[in-house]
Structures are given as C-alpha cells and as structure tokens.
Amino acid sequence: MASESVKVVVRCRPMNKRERELSCQSVVTVDSARGQCFIQNPGAADEPPKQFTFDGAYYIEHFTEQIYNEIAYPLVEGVTEGYNGTIFAYGQTGSGKSFTMQGLPDPPCQRGIIPRAFEHVFESVQCAENTKFLVRASYLEIYNEDVHDLLGADTKQRLELKEHPEKGVYVKGLSMHTVHNVAQCERVMETGWKNRAVGYTLMNKDSSRSHSIFTINIEIYAVDERGKDHLRAGKLNLVDLAGSERQSKTGATGERLKEATKINLSLSALGNVISALVDGRCKHIPYRDSKLTRLLQDSLGGNTKTLMVACLSPADNNYDETLSTLRYANRAKNIKNKPRINEDPKDALLREYQEEIKRLKAILAQQMGPGNLSALLSTQTPPGPVQSEEKLLSPTTVQQDTEAEKQLIREEYEERLARLKADYEAEQESRVRLQEDITAMRNSYDVKLSTLQENLRKEKETEAILKAEVLCKTEVMSRAELASGPEYSPPLQYETAVKPTILSMPDMPPSGKVTKSQAPLAFEEPHGETSRSEFSFESNECSTLEDSATSEAFPGPEEFSNMEFSMAAALTESRYLPEEYLGGQEAAASPLEAERYVQENEPSLEPLRILASLQDPFAEVEAKLARLSSTVAMSDSSQTVVPQIPKQPSSADLLEPSDTKSEADVAVADNVVLGTEPDVNLRVAEEVVSEAETGVWMESEAQVAHVAQVSEEAQPQPLLAMVSVRRESVGVEVAVLTEEELQPVDQQQVLARLQLLEQQVVGGEQAKNKDLREKHKRRKRYADERKKQLVAALQNSDEDGGDWVLLNVYDSIQEEVRAKSKLLEKMQRKLRAAEVEIKDLQSEFQLEKIDYLATIRRQERDSMLFQQLLEQVQPLIRRDCNYSNLEKIRRESSWDEDNGFWKIPDPIILKTSLPVVPTGTQNKPARKTSAVDSGEPHMQEEDRYKLMLSRSDSENIASNYFRSKRASQILSTDPMKSLTYHNSPPGLNSSLSNNSALPPTQTPEMPQPRPFRLESLDIPFSKAKRKKSKNSFGGEPL
C-alpha cells in the first residue's frame, strides 16, 4: 500500500487592530513561489532568519480561493472517489484559523475552505455519469473535553466515543443529516456555528472556545461498463481547532481560564502525537491522551489524506507562538499516511436504498405494468428551485417524515415476518400430526392385511378341495359326456369370465382413485363419526366431501365378501401410490404380483354373486360430485357469500421443491376425513376457511379444485406479489417478495415512498453540461500544474547552491575572488543559521528538560505528602473496613483507558454478629414497669433514657463481649445490688433474698453474683456459725 506524507501549508494573516495599536513589527516573510517561510528573531537582529519549507506558503495578499484551488482541491476530489480526507487549521488563538475554515460570505474570494468544499463536492456529484451519491453531514464540537452534537436536539448533551474495527473511532449518537445541494449544507453549517461555544478575550473578541469538526459522509454507487455494481464510501473532516493561548496575553479568568487549560491540554496532546509519529523509535502513540487526538487518529498516520493549514501571526510580540507553530508544522510534514479507497462498506445506507427502490418498482410494475410505470415516472418532474427551497426551509420536518416512514416500513415488515413465522410453525405442527396419523393408519392396515391373508389362506384350502372334487368328477364323466361339454363350464372358463369384472373396478384414472386405507375403512367401519374421530386431521378438512361420497358409495355390513373385494381393490390400487407411502408388506407387492394373486386365488360363488349385484362406486362418486357442484352454484346464486381469506405460505413453500412435492403427495394419499353432514353449503364454507387458515393446498382433489374455481368466479383475485425466505449473515429470516398472494398495497403510498428514496440520492444531474465538466477539469489541471511549478522552483533553489558554479571561467583573478567571496558569505550565513537553529533547539530542549524535571520533582513531593498522610490516617481506619488493607485495594484497582481514571473498590464495612451478653441492665424494664405503676412521670422519663443507653451498650459488641462482669457488678450504681451483695454479710444473703419487701417479680430476674474470693474461703465458718446460731436459737426459751 502506497504511503504519502501529510500536506502542510502556512498562511500569514495581516496585523489586527490590537497589534497595530501596540506598534508591532512584522517578523514573518513568505516566498510563495518556493513555498518557504522565514521568521526573524526580534531580539537578535544580527542573526539570520529561520527558514522553513512547506507544500505551500501564503502571505497577507493571498486569498482563500487560491489556497483551496492549489492545495485543498485534489484532496476533496479524492473524497468523491472513495478516499478519506481531513483538513484542519492549527495555530495560536487569533491567528486566523476560523477565518480560513469558515471565511466571509462577502467578498466571494474570502469564503472559507468549508463552503468551498461544499461547492466542490456537489459539482463533482452533478458531473458524474452512471453514479449515484448519498451525501450526509454532521457537526460536533469538543468543549472542555466533552463531545457535543451541534445539530442535535440537545446541544449540551455529552456523547461517548466508541471504536469499531472497520469504521475506526466514531461518536455514538451523533446525528446525520442528508443534504442534496450546497444551500442545505450551508444552512446546516450555519445552524451548528450558532450553537458553537465562543468567547471574548484580549486577543480575539470572537475566540473559539472549542474544537469543531464538520464531517461530510459520501456513499458512491457506480455501475461500470459491464453492468456490475460498485459501492464506495468517502469521508471529509473539516476541523477548526481552538487556538493555544497564554493567560498573560488573553487575560482569561474564571471560566475562560478553565477553557484555555483544556484547549492547551488537547493541543499539547496533538503536538505529542505529531512528535511521536515523526520519531520512528516511539512504539506507543498517545492518541488516548485527548478526545481530539482520538477523533483525528485516522487522520494522523492512518487511512486518510490529510492537509494541515498552519496559521501565523506576523507580529513580533507573538514570536514564540509563531515559531512553535512553524516547528510543529515542519514536524507534521514527516507523518506518513496510508490512504486507500473504501470499497464495499458493509454498513452502507445507499445499498439499502437501492434495494428498496428496486423492490418498490417491482411492486408498481406488477400493479400497473412496465409501460405504465415508466410513463408515470417520466411524468413525475423533479421539483423546481422554488419548490426545493420551500422544502429546504424545514429540514427537521423532512427528517421526521423520513423517520416516521422508516418506522412504518419496519413495523409492516415485522408484522409480515411474524405472520410468516406463525404460519410456518403451524404447518410444522400439522406436519407432525400428519406423520403420527400416517403411522397409525399403517399399523391398522398391517393388522387388517394379516387378517385378510389368513382368511384368503383358509379360502384357498377350501377352493383346492372343491377343485379336486371337480377334477375327479371330470375324469369320470369326460368320456361319456364329451359332446355335452358346453353345458358344464369348467372353473377355469368361469374364472376367465369373472376376472375382467373384478379388475375393471380399480383400474380407473389416478385422479379419482381410492387409497388403500379408504377401501377397507369404507367396508369395515361404515359409521362416519367413529372414523372421523380416529383419522381426521385439522389441516386436511378439504377431503371431507370425497370421503363422505366414498362412504355412501360402499354401504353394507362387514362381510367376508366385502373384505375380499376391498383386498383385491387395494392390491390393484397400489400401482398408483409411491412406494414411500407403503409399509414393509405393501411395498413388496407390485402390480404384477397383485394380478397374479387375483388369478390364483379366485373368490367363491357367493362373493361373485354379491359383486355382480354391486354398482360401480366411482360412477356414483362422480354423480355425487356433480350434485355437489350444482348445489354450490345454487348457493352462490342465492347470494350465499363465502368469505375468502388470503392464503398464507405454507411449510411446503418454505422447503425445497422435492419436499413440496412429497408434502402434496402425502396430503393427497394419506389424509382421509370421513363425514356425513347433510348441510353442503356449510361444509363448503368450512373447507374454504380452514384451507385459508392452515395454508394446505390440495390441488389434486377434484372437489377442492371446483370450490376454488367457484371462489375465483365469485371474488376477484388479490395482487400477486413475491414472498420467499432468505437468511441473512446474522441468521435472521428476512421476507423478500416472491410469487404468493398478499394483500393489495396502496399504489400512492408506494409511489410516494419511491419518489422519496430517489430524492435522497443525487448524482448525474449535470452530466451532459459540457461547460461545467470543462470547468471541473480545468480546476483539476490547475492544481496539478501548481504542484509541478512548486517542485521546479525547489529544484532551482537547490541548483543555486550547488558546486556547478565553480565551472565558470573567470576573466581575472579579482572576479574569481569576488565570486568565491560571495559563495563563502552565503555558506557562512547558512552555517550561522544552522548554528542558531542548533542553539534554539538545544535551548528548547533544555527548557523542556527543566520543565520535565520540575514536574517530576513536584510530583515526587506530592507523592511523599500523600504517603505521609496515608501513614497517619491508615491506623484510624476500622479493622472491619476493606480499606484497612491497602495492598489488597491496590491489587483490586485497575486503570480505565477510555475514561482516564482508576477503578477502585467501594468502601465496605464488615459487621460481625456475636451473641448478646446478658448484663445487669436487663432488670431495668422491671423497674420501668414499677415506675409506671407508681405513676411517677420523671422516673418514667429517666427509665426510658436508661433503656436507650443500655441498648447502645448492648450493640457495642467489641466492648461488652469480652468485658469482665465482676467489675461491672462492683461498679454498678444500682443501690439494690450494692445493698444485697456487697454491703450485707454473707450469712444474711438468704434472708435478704427471701425479704418480702422486694417485689416478687424482681426476685427470679436478679442474676446470681459471683462470690468473692474471701467468701469462698469462709464457707465452713459460715456453716458452723449458722449451725451454732440455730442451736442457740433453739435452746433459748421462748
């Protein structure tokens, strides 16, 4: 893939009023012919000026028109071919960036790059042949590192940046506006420009306080000579950056100072990206340092053609800013991009428009015919300029109408898809039930076939005995009655005479045949209700009429003769059924074997007499069908309306052709419904409704065909459209038009939608305008010629400094000395300029080094301060908090690249629930009760406060659980406790415990205190003393 460098041009503006009032001197000179820019240091007038060479250099006398025609024109032309392009202005605040990008409406020569790009894009679009374009515009700004949509409903809403593997970095939720001409683009630009953040500073009264990006997205649909479609996509980013500024010059304070800080940070990140791209040793490009660099990521070193316009101020008091701008612009020349044509984008909206236009034209062609459609489209003249201007007055209304139309189409499509899915699921369920019923019928047929074989075997034995007797009698009487042979017919002749009668019944055309299951059922189960409940199917009620007629054509009880006849008919009928619908036994029986079986096993005389008395069943069926058709005709003539419901595609339509055929065969051969309803009209209506609901088509049935014919005569057919199911790459079934019956569409709505879609795309309106095409080619040639002139001028400047001048022949030695003196002076000036450049670079590097070291020292001091504060604060953190372990918090933390901050765990306090320790304060509710009973209000209030304190103490688990209970009892302020356990002698504890003065409710609640150590040693003494006192009391006389 070929790479190209970033194109860089410089433009120097005239001095403004402020600079003229300060009597500033110009320090910038420009050589436009060679694309060189010179800047003189005002503090060192003896030093040579610094020289920079770019792709173009423009001074105060040049207009924006010349800049665009020479430099920007090839880049925008590439966008109309499928490339990505970016044009951005770079420079300090008040250097003319917005003037270069936006410009002035009057005079026309000072119009900016953005409006000229509009004209260029639509000029190329109108001149293109066999190509359609979809042009959409968006406008955003980056204010204080927040992305805002300047064309959205809420211009202050923050938008997020996302990254896509194919689209790259994009803004989620950014509004896109379809534009059709230059006027709409200018109106969109003006709307966004009014919403942009601007402010007043000392250097510029209308200073841009945000970076803005106007994007034009172009989708190109071209058809080559072979008729093959090609889809491409191009994108043009027109960037107007906010300028870097110094607070000392702009006087920014408060909100303006905050804005300036954010602007300088983003521009500094942009400069770091440029430096990293130029430096080949840098492996990491800091695109994520700013949202501006992320949005320009593809423009700097990616798949984009990029043009940088460096705007300069000629004043000497802006020398440092101008020199910095020139250095960054000179570095940007070395950035290599790899642009390529974006072919066949997957998310192209133009592809969807083209497919929908084709579909709508197909629908209209089916309704009106191709000739009428072309005539109608030709009569629809495009709106004139006045009408288009009227429509352009409300682009928001047009967008809302478009969104409403999209929503309507989406809802219609989802409803149709849901209906198709429901029908498909119903058909699948019906098919499952059909297979189950087929299996049940096969099992029943096998049982009946085995019974028939057993009966035929017994009959064969009886017939063999009869034949043996007849042969014996024939041998005896052959000689005597040879002349009277015709009077007695042998059985062989009788069999030959009877066989055509048997075989003539089943040998009918396949359209009126009776299946193998129908014949046995008709003879063995004459009751229609029983067989209906056993063999009927929901999706095949249309065969009810035929089965009813069959049950009436073969009446009679279940006899052996009927069983034998049904067996013969079933074996003969097997020639018209496929083998896959037969079981293991019936598949083995071929038509020849069936005939051989009939010939070898002739029925007895009794079955033959019954067969002779039977009528032709198929003739009776035909008669009943004729009566049915006449009844249906009479019902139609008597205005009995049969509702006609549009058919939905069945499961057979969603399968392969072979599957469709087998489904129809199964429906014809195996779906039997026996019924005996007398009301024919009701039966016909039910069949039509059930057929429309389930979508099962029984085309081979004679009565269904007749009912369909009657329905066609009664009501007109709806529009035939095309519906099929195709599967997209994501695995979703999408409905596409095929030949099925759908509801009629509104012709006016389809035509309006078609015209709306065709108006969305533009291209080729002026393809036959020779003047416009010639102008377009002339501007393209001018840009190429200007590029060649610049290359030639640079070569001439290199030749002037070459060694070929030494070949000149001098007339005298003095002339040679003067020539070499001039050459020496020139080389000395170059050497001095190089030394000054080296000195400036070293001083700049030294200043950056000092700045970096100062920043590192400041960060180290801040880090030490935070570390000391942390060491002092960490012991104060509770142990049950997760932040008491900072190493664990450090391991759990992670850096968020997108948002630029650390993700740290939330502070959590772990509470451990321990059992509550019973203390002496548990008897306070009793005292509260006594206080309440006594009716003292102040005591009641005091008890309430004591209860609150006791609860707070009990909740403090860490202080109460391991606290000594002895100390709390000793230090207890309860006078009752101190009186009972500490002030009394040990011998009186029992008497005090039994004291009647205490309330009885407090006695069991008072806890037993732990004894003192001295009391435990005095236990024997106390016992003896108690015994002695008892004796003394007992011995003393009362």
From Swiss-Prot:
Query: Which organs or tissues contain this protein?
Result: Highly expressed in the gray matter of the brain, especially in the hippocampus.
User: Where does this protein come from, organism-wise?
Assistant: Mus musculus
Q: Which gene encodes it?
A: Kif17
> Where would one find coiled-coil regions in this protein?
346-470, 748-855
GO biological-process terms attached to the record? anterograde dendritic transport of neurotransmitter receptor complex; intraciliary transport; microtubule-based process; protein transport; protein-containing complex localization; vesicle-mediated transport
> Which coarse location class describes where this protein primarily resides?
cytoplasm
* Pfam hit, one: Kinesin
What name goes with this protein?
Kinesin-like protein KIF17
Q: Name one GO molecular function term.
A: microtubule binding
- Which classification does the entry list for the species? Eukaryota, Metazoa, Chordata, Craniata, Vertebrata
- PROSITE patterns tied to this protein: KINESIN_MOTOR_1, KINESIN_MOTOR_2
> One GO term of the cellular component aspect?
ciliary basal body
